[in-house]
Amino acid sequence: ICAFIVGATQRTPVNVLPHLYQIIGSFFDTKSITGSGDTIATLVFSSAAETLSRALIGFIIGMVLGYILALLMHLSHIVEKIAFPYLMIIQMLPILGMAPIVLSITGDISSARIIIAAILTFYPVSTNTLAGFKSVGRERHELMRSYGASKFQLYTKMLIPSAMSYFFTGLKISAP
């Protein structure tokens, strides 16, 4: 709305704030903007596809690592006591402050973006999945053990299915 008001007053030069019809028209223009013959539309769509693929790869990596860490923290209280404070520290650090550090470590902007997306996904998935594992009542544990269930059966038949709603809540929180 502000762009229309500023554009209507004609106080800004066209090279600073072009009219809306010029912006839309340039998107559909068939003139090449690069040496390889790309138009604006192909450049925008190819860049969007690259960004989406990096975000999806980082989301999958963070999801898998968060789930594995939650499983390990539930299996061993020592792992939970060691890992949980670091999880809290990672969550407390601002991602914009962490981005230059990740970029300097990796040296590649593409892999840095994937790592940042994984970090953003990692914390909500791991903490929510751990909460899901811990939400199973003691009575259910005792019932499964009275039926002679092994630890593997305890996880596959009771704990993992019970934690799925928490896991998907973590995914929903971490997805933008």
Model-found features: residue ranges?
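Generic hydrophobic transmembrane alpha-helix motif, especially the helices
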Residues: 87-124, 131-132
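Transmembrane-helix boundary motif in ABC transporter permease subunits
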Residues: 57-87
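Periplasmic/extracellular loop-to-transmembrane helix junction in inner-membrane transport proteins
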Residues: 9-60
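N-terminal signal-anchor/first transmembrane alpha helix
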Residues: 1-8
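Hydrophobic alpha-helical transmembrane segments in multi-pass membrane proteins
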Residues: 50, 54-63, 96, 100, ...
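Intracellular coupling helices
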Residues: 134-145, 152-153, 157
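Transmembrane alpha-helices
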Residues: 115, 119, 152-176
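Alpha-helical membrane-interface segments at transmembrane helix boundaries
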Residues: 45-53, 80, 87-90, 107, ...
